[in-house]
């Protein structure tokens, strides 16, 4: 239980010029975890001293980043079963105060609009055509071709707001919605491109022959076949590798999201963010 008087007294000492006192106060406040953030934010608004403001902001970020790392570690160690949860954890890196339920509700709304129109006997391609119609035509999602390196393309909440994303963020939303509708669509970690596969569930144990077709979520849900993947790999001078054709793990998907963010922030020259994102990448092995 936090003692407000003690916490506020510690916060007032954050601008102390004595480094030993500052280090002690910093560690003490850090130990409170997320409970102390509300007090720090109030103090930030009331602070006139630039050093104190900077130290408060850094401390808030440190607490939030530490919590994010712990949550990502727990998600990974628990089996990484929920792709949406993993994506929301990464989203908190840039938007720590966002209510996850808001994002979940947005995805549920899209799912519901598809479900209402879905026929029980629809074939796999008919199912995908309906998802494409609702996702791209009604909701207006599209690939961000004009600013592909923008880090916002990788943050789920922003993609849902702007309706623009990169290959992997659009594929994540698409596959999460499909799976909520019991449609077997999963991510495939193709080099330089992230695609989706529609599985023939009766042959799920053998992914290579159990894939009915592939889907390009970045290009309005375009359906294509194995030969197209063969040709793409040939253009890249890459030899056959089963992993380029088969669904990958949720951990692999989140690692790719983080790598995209690292590239985006390297492009912007944000060394601190690159270092922190590498920490997140290391958690996933």
Regions found by a protein language model. Give the residues of each.
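A structural boundary/capping signal
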Residues: 1-285
